[in-house]
Design a protein with these regions (language model features):
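Acidic (Asp/Glu-rich) sequence patches and key acidic residues
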Residues: 1-132, 136-140, 149-150
Length: 150
């Protein structure tokens, strides 16, 4: 299962420097404030959390991301990771402004992509950690990033 770590950082340049210095290893914990999120990809599973917060159906544009590291691999079909993407600030701000986290966790725990049977208490702990990270990022005026490894 692919690994996804979400973190906040001052900007994409700081992320590139940290990943270059660390050989591509996750910067979560060692360099940047973040959380581990095995199996929670930005464009589908995290976007479904954003949809639950907004109380709207999932759509592909709820979480936009752009590759920031490594530079130049967008067209390389042989490259198999890791990667880092920067998430759009609107997704960060929706998550940072989330209320009624028990409702969000109940809805999100039932999504098909998580198997539809995640324990709601576990889902709530994870939702709270994502929301807290988004709030810290917004407070610091920093973007959210996602480190991805296959």
């Amino acid at each position: 299962m692919p690994l996804f770590d979400y973190f906040r950082a001052p900007d994409a340049d700081a992320v590139r420097q940290a990943l270059d210095a660390g050989g591509g290893a996750t910067p979560v914990g060692a360099v940047f404030d973040g959380i581990e999120a095995k199996g929670v990809d930005p464009s589908v599973v995290l976007a479904m959390m954003v949809a639950a917060v907004r109380q709207v159906p999932w759509s592909a544009d709820l979480v936009d991301d752009r590759l920031v590291w490594p530079v130049g691999v967008e067209q390389d079909p042989e490259y198999d990771g890791p990667w880092v993407s920067e998430l759009n600030t609107s997704a960060r701000d929706v998550l940072a402004g989330a209320g009624d986290l028990p409702r969000v966790a109940r809805e999100w725990a039932r999504i098909e992509e998580l198997g539809g049977n995640v324990d709601v208490a576990d889902a709530q702990v994870f939702v709270e950690s994502v929301v807290d990270l988004a709030r810290r990022a917004r407070e610091a005026d920093e973007p959210l990033f996602c480190w991805i490894s296959l």
